[in-house]
C-alpha cells in the first residue's frame, strides 16, 4: 500500500506540473530525457547475455554448485593483489591520466601535494570514499587507503569527481556550479578506464592482467561493491 501511494503521488505531481509522465519528471532531476532512459534499458537488454556469461564464469572460478548475489562480492583474484604506497599510486594515476592533457595532470599533481585528500584509515572515520565540492576553496576527497588495486582505482575515481568539481567551480558561478549524478559518474569512470588501460598496457604478468581486468569489470557490473560516490 505504501508503494502504491508513492506511485499515485508521483503520478499526481507529474500531472499537476504538466509532465507527460512521472518518468519524465523523474529523469529531469538528472537533466536527462525519457529517450535517454529508454535507450539505456534497451542497450542493457540487448547485451545482457554478456553479464550472464560473466556470472557463469565467476561461478566456475569460485567452484560453486550455485551462485547467489552474496557470492558476487567475492574476489577470486585476491591472491594476486599487491600493496602499493600511496605516493606510487598517485604517480601511477598521473601517468595514466596523461591523455587528459598537461593542464589537467599538473592541477591533479598540485591537488595531491596540497592536502585535498584525507587518505588513510583512522578511528571512527566513515568507510568508503567520497568527494565533497566546496565552492570558492577546492574539493575535499575522503579515502580509506590500504594499498590494494581497488584503492588505487579509487584514487583515480574520486579525483575524477574532484577535478570535475574544480573545473566546474572555476568556470561557473555559485548558483550554477553543481552537476547531476549522471554527469558526475562520466568524469570518474573515464579516469578509471584510463588507469585500467595504462596498467594493462604496462603489465607483463598474465595473472596480474586478469586481476586488473576483473577489477575493471566489478566497477561496471557490480556497482554495489562501491558504497560511495
Give residue spans per PLM region.
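Cation-handling catalytic/transport regions enriched in His/Asp/Glu
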Residues: 1-221, 225
Amino acid at each position: 500500500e505504501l508503494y502504491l501511494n508513492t506511485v499515485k503521488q508521483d503520478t499526481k505531481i507529474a500531472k499537476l506540473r504538466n509532465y507527460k509522465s512521472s518518468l519524465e519528471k523523474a529523469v529531469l532531476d538528472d537533466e536527462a530525457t525519457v529517450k535517454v532512459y529508454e535507450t539505456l534499458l534497451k542497450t542493457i537488454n540487448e547485451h545482457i547475455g554478456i553479464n550472464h556469461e560473466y556470472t557463469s564464469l565467476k561461478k566456475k572460478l569460485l567452484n560453486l554448485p550455485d551462485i547467489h548475489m552474496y557470492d558476487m562480492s567475492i574476489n577470486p583474484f585476491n591472491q594476486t593483489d599487491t600493496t602499493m604506497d600511496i605516493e606510487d599510486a598517485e604517480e601511477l594515476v598521473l601517468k595514466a591520466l596523461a591523455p587528459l592533457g598537461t593542464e589537467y595532470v599538473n592541477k591533479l599533481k598540485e591537488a595531491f601535494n596540497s592536502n585535498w585528500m584525507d587518505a588513510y584509515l583512522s578511528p571512527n572515520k566513515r568507510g568508503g570514499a567520497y568527494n565533497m565540492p566546496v565552492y570558492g576553496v577546492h574539493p575535499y576527497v575522503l579515502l580509506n587507503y590500504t594499498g590494494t588495486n581497488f584503492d588505487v582505482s579509487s584514487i583515480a575515481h574520486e579525483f575524477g569527481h574532484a577535478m570535475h568539481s574544480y573545473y566546474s567551480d572555476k568556470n561557473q558561478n555559485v548558483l550554477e556550479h553543481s552537476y547531476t549524478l549522471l554527469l558526475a559518474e562520466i568524469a570518474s569512470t573515464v579516469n578509471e578506464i584510463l588507469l585500467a588501460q595504462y596498467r594493462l598496457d604496462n603489465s607483463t604478468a598474465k595473472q596480474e592482467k586478469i586481476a586488473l581486468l576483473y577489477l575493471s569489470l566489478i566497477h561496471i557490473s557490480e556497482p554495489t561493491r562501491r558504497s560511495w560516490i
